[in-house]
């Protein structure tokens, strides 16, 4: 009976089946194992190559889980673990921001919800909407009544407030010269104030009785347009020469003059809108006429002429 050959005590039963003492290629991976994903560390010990976020620090292949993540203990799934503070809320792994009054979502952005009277200015700050065009509440002498004079002789207070599709107006006149303050020593007096505006709603001072431009009440800017305060040329078209008059261009009313002795004298007030177009520079016109027709003159001596406020409304031009 033949004897089996005895294996060397240094024989390695793992491929390539060589004696460690005689092997010319120590620690070569077996032919059926790819080096991709594996490494020998230390030599002769096969292990996995791990890069973040994988680790075998605990003896098994695991994910390194940082703050905000957790592994579900029931099914082993990876889940977020984010905590939120008020006003944020969390529901079904979604973070929400409750929206209160004054806020809205617009084009997937959180925005301020502005009501009437508010707007965004050029710096994207919330500002009061410029819906008031005026002379100011108490102007200096700014208007010329006496024909041919160069210096203002009266104070015109004019306030125009946009309200939807109309403008609400307020006007009053105060004398600032001997000429104006002696007018009511007469029984019959007519005081005429003409305002001519360009295409952007700015006063043309060389042709207007008012010699200073009207201003916005809030945040005056040098290049603002006041067109939206002007009387609509559709509602109040200019009257062509020899074409008669348009009654819709006239607003009639009454205010009062209080004499030095306390007596009240009615003044007929006529507001004429786009009465006539004097030249190519003019796009809008407002004319104010105060008329006194009294049996007796209100004054016997000089007294400051002050008309009571007169209010009116008209359809405005589009902005």
From Swiss-Prot:
The keyword Repeat applies. The keyword Nucleotidyltransferase does not apply. GO terms for cellular component: host cell nucleus; viral capsid. It comes from the Viruses. InterPro entries: Adeno_fibre, Adeno_fibre_knob, Adenobir_fibre_prot_rpt/shaft, Adenovirus_pIV-like_att, Attachment_protein_shaft_sf. Pfam families: Adeno_knob, Adeno_shaft. One of its GO terms (biological process) is adhesion receptor-mediated virion attachment to host cell. Homotrimer. Interacts with host receptor CD46. Interacts (via N-terminal tail region) with pentons. Belongs to the adenoviridae fiber family. Forms spikes that protrude from each vertex of the icosahedral capsid. Interacts with host receptor CD46 to provide virion initial attachment to target cell. Fiber proteins are shed during virus entry, when virus is still at the cell surface. Heparan sulfate might also play a role in virus binding. This is Fiber protein. It comes from Human adenovirus B serotype 3.
């Amino acid at each position: 009976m033949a004897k089996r050959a005895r294996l060397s005590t240094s024989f390695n039963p793992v491929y390539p089946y060589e004696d460690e003492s005689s092997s010319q290629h120590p620690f070569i991976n077996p032919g059926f194992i790819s080096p991709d994903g594996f490494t020998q560390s230390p030599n002769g010990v096969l292990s996995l190559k791990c890069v973040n976020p994988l680790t075998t620090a605990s003896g098994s292949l695991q994910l390194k889980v940082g703050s905000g993540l957790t592994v579900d203990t029931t099914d082993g799934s990876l889940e977020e673990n984010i905590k939120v503070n008020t006003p944020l809320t969390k529901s079904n792994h979604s973070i929400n921001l409750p929206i209160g009054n004054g806020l809205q979502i617009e084009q997937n952005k959180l925005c301020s919800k502005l009501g009437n009277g508010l707007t965004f200015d050029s710096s994207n700050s919330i500002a009061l909407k410029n819906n008031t065009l005026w002379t100011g509440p108490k102007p200096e002498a700014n208007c010329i009544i006496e024909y041919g004079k160069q210096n203002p002789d009266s104070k015109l207070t004019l306030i125009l407030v946009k309200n939807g599709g109309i403008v609400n107006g307020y006007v009053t006149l105060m004398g600032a010269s001997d000429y104006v303050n002696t007018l009511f020593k007469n029984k019959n007096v007519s005081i005429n104030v003409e305002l001519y505006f360009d295409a952007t709603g700015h006063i043309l001072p060389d042709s207007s009785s008012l010699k200073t431009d009207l201003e916005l009440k809030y945040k005056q800017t040098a290049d603002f347009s006041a067109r939206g305060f002007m009387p609509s040329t559709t509602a109040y078209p200019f009257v062509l020469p020899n074409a008669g008059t348009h009654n819709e261009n006239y607003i009639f009313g009454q205010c009062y003059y209080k004499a030095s002795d306390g007596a009240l004298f009615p003044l007929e007030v006529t507001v004429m809108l786009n009465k006539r177009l004097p030249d190519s520079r003019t796009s809008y016109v407002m004319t104010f006429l105060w008329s006194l027709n009294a049996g007796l003159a209100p004054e016997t001596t000089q007294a400051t002429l002050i008309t009571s406020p007169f209010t009116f409304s008209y359809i405005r031009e589009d902005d």
